[in-house]
């Protein structure tokens, strides 16, 4: 019994010491808040055996607070959250709600100038249009008839101009497909800002088509946009005057023109 009593008393003493030391640290914090430090003449310095442990404990606390960096979000965390929100957050204008795997598939489809079956189905589903048996997009007039507006889908272009325009149908009617040229010169580009697409290909259009007020073209003439390998006359994209406009034939062409500053 005597051993048990000693152990119990020792535990009580340790508890009291810990409680007193914790209160002492709390008082030290209050002293610092009031503008006083432990070393000021008006305060008594801690003496006895508790002085060293208290000082070392506070030093350890300060060192730990200095040595441990502040917690911050991992690099790219905002992009990760944006990616989880779908391309609307990541790319700024898709709004198709694709997850990361679907997004990678979409990017591969862009780089290879191809269209994955998933992308076709996703676009048709987004447009609330049942895809035909052959898996192709409905024609733009059909989408127009259903009241669907045109929207851009980014920088993606197809070698097939009709499919490229079909993709463009899934975005906003006020914004033309990025490859569809509407301002062939910097003069008209300043007068009509934003009409030449994201890259602004007016200068190249002006060199290929001459000094026209707008980049209009004739759908019955294959060469009305200059080099048919670079630009084609669109049957569906029209300027604000109702005239057909020239479109880049591929993403590569559009990117080349954009890199040249147009």
From Swiss-Prot:
Signal peptide: 1-22
Region (Disordered): 26-84
Keyword Signal included in the entry's annotation: yes
GO cellular component, one term: extracellular region
Tissue: Expressed in mantle and, after secretion, incorporated into acid-insoluble nacre matrix of the shell (at protein level). Expressed primarily in the mantle with highest level in the mantle pallium and lower level in the mantle edge.
Biased composition (Low complexity): 26-35
Domain of life: Eukaryota
Keywords for this protein: Secreted, Signal
Cellular compartments annotated: Secreted
Main location: secreted
Record field: compositional bias (Polar residues): 36-84
Name of the featured protein: Methionine-rich nacre protein
């Amino acid at each position: 019994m005597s051993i048990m009593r000693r152990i119990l008393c020792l535990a009580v003493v340790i508890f009291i010491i810990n409680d007193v030391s914790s209160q002492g640290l709390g008082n030290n914090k209050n002293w610092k808040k009031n503008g006083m430090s432990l070393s000021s003449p008006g305060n008594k310095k801690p003496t006895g055996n508790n002085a060293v442990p208290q000082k070392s404990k506070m030093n350890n606390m300060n060192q730990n607070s200095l040595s441990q960096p502040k917690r911050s979000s991992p690099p790219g965390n905002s992009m990760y959250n944006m990616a989880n929100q779908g391309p609307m957050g990541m790319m700024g204008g898709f709004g198709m709600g694709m997850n990361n795997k679907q997004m990678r598939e979409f990017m591969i489809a862009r780089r290879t100038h191809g269209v994955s079956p998933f992308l076709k189905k996703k676009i048709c589903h987004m447009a609330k249009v049942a895809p035909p048996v052959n898996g192709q997009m409905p024609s733009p007039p059909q989408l127009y008839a259903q009241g669907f507006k045109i929207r851009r889908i980014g920088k993606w272009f197809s070698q097939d101009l009709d499919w490229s325009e079909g993709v463009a149908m899934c975005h906003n009617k006020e914004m033309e497909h990025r490859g569809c040229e509407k301002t062939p010169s910097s003069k008209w580009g300043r007068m009509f800002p934003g009409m030449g697409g994201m890259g602004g290909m007016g200068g190249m259009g002006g060199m290929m088509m001459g000094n026209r007020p707008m980049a209009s073209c004739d759908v019955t003439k294959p060469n009305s946009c200059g080099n048919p390998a670079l630009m084609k006359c669109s049957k569906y994209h029209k300027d604000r005057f109702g005239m057909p406009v020239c479109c880049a034939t591929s993403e590569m062409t559009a990117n080349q023109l954009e890199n040249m500053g147009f």
